[in-house]
């Protein structure tokens, strides 16, 4: 069945805003500007402040939810139920995981390429599958285990591509390796977040936009408060600011004042995450979970292609191979091969409802699927 203009718009919005989210964060990292007190020109490395901005974008989803709820008042078939009771503190543990994982990923993005960052995030399938078996009592089928193995193989290939690629003075080999490992570590935390959301949040049938906004509120408030002690905690060579501390928000604002384009990149990152979450939820509702996963894979291609075009990274054939293997792993884990096999065997393809149930039940996307 042909897509409507509304569905095409939602798919395009998800693809564009998802790509902007990662690329704008990397664009901000690439800027050089003077900091406070006449400090020398240095790169904009403020991952924790960027994470605060991302949570601000997620927090804005609460406004979208209440707008939808006001619009849906009096409609009996509305999915936005104003009477849904839930305890907001249920979102605190997933929000803490989201805060930790997001901060790690922003630190890693300073060290590695945007395309590797996006591809290595596919590792979440491995840990989600293992944790769902251990803590949710789920039994994985053969195709899901094969998907996990394929994902591991794809991660190895992408890692080899990073090792064999030429590295400039900004991204030394040791930093690239550290960045890649931090991304993998972050996916463990994201997988824990997904398990917590499924165990404690999904059963309350909270609207996804409300869930995203509530987690964003917790993350924004907590991480904003943590910026104060981070200003004084020494981090040595791990730090990217002249004072050598874990985070220097004042230095970041001084750099933004001296290079206004950094503000453009940060605003792009903040706004894109809000629209990306809204578009992703809408695509799953209007089309299918399969479509959302295909678009997410296309997002990786767009990020990789634009990074090459902008000269942010060098071409390496192993990255293509690694991405294809990761794509196969994702497809196997989420059962995307079954409709294809059904058509090849001239069987009746499964209905869209059962497809959504299988995909969302087998591997839920985190409520706030960031960059």
UniProtKB/Swiss-Prot annotation:
Residues 1-25 form the signal peptide. It is a multi-pass membrane protein. It comes from the Eukaryota. The modification Phosphothreonine is found at residue 365. Glycans are attached at residue 110. InterPro entries: SLC35_F1/F2/F6, UCP036436. Keywords: Glycoprotein, Lysosome, Membrane, Mitochondrion, Phosphoprotein, Signal, Transmembrane, Transmembrane helix, Transport. The keyword Transmembrane helix applies. One of its GO terms (biological process) is negative regulation of mitochondrial outer membrane permeabilization involved in apoptotic signaling pathway. Residues 104-160 form the EamA domain. The chain crosses the membrane at residues 48-68, 89-109, 117-137, 140-160, 176-196, 216-236, 261-281, 295-312, 317-336. SUPFAM superfamilies: Multidrug resistance efflux transporter EmrE. Coiled coil: none annotated. It is found in: Mitochondrion; Lysosome membrane. The keyword Ligase does not apply. Its main location: mitochondrion. Residues 347-371 are annotated as: Disordered. One of its GO terms (molecular function) is transmembrane transporter activity. Involved in the maintenance of mitochondrial membrane potential in pancreatic ductal adenocarcinoma (PDAC) cells. Promotes pancreatic ductal adenocarcinoma (PDAC) cell growth. May play a role as a nucleotide-sugar transporter. PANTHER family: PTHR13146, SOLUTE CARRIER FAMILY 35 MEMBER F6. Interacts with SLC25A5. This is Solute carrier family 35 member F6. It comes from Pongo abelii. The gene is SLC35F6.
């Amino acid at each position: 069945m042909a897509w409507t203009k509304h569905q095409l718009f939602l798919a395009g919005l998800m693809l564009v805003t998802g790509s902007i989210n990662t690329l704008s964060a990397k664009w901000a990292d690439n800027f050089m500007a003077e900091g406070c007190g006449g400090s020398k020109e240095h790169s904009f490395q403020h991952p924790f402040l960027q994470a605060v901005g991302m949570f601000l974008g997620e927090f804005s989803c609460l406004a979208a939810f209440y707008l939808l709820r006001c619009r849906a008042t009096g409609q009996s078939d509305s999915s936005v139920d104003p009477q849904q009771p839930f305890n907001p503190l249920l979102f605190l543990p997933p929000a803490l995981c989201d805060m930790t994982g997001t901060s790690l990923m922003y630190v890693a993005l300073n060290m590695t390429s945007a395309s590797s960052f996006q591809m290595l995030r596919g590792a979440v399938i491995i840990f989600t599958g293992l944790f769902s078996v251990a803590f949710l009592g789920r039994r994985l089928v053969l195709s899901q285990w094969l998907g996990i193995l394929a994902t591991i193989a794809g991660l190895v290939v992408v890692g080899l591509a990073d090792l064999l690629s030429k590295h400039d003075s900004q991204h030394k080999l040791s930093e690239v390796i550290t960045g890649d490992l931090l991304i993998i570590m972050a996916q463990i935390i994201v997988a824990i977040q997904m398990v917590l959301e499924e165990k404690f949040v999904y059963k309350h049938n909270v609207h996804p936009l409300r869930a995203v906004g509530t987690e964003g509120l917790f993350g924004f408030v907590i991480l904003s408060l943590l910026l104060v002690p981070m200003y004084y905690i020494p981090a040595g060579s791990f730090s990217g600011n002249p004072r050598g501390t874990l985070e220097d928000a004042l230095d970041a604002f001084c750099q933004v004042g001296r290079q206004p384009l950094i503000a453009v990149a940060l605003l792009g990152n903040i706004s894109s995450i809000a629209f990306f979450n809204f578009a992703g939820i809408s695509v799953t509702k209007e089309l299918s979970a399969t479509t959302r996963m295909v678009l997410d894979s296309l997002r990786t291609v767009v990020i990789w292609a634009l990074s090459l075009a902008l000269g942010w990274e060098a071409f390496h054939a192993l990255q293509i191979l690694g991405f294809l293997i990761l794509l196969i792993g994702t497809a196997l884990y989420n059962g995307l091969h079954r409709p294809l096999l059904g058509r090849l065997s001239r069987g009746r393809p499964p209905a869209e409802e059962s497809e959504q149930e299988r995909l969302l039940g087998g591997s839920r996307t985190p409520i706030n699927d960031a960059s």
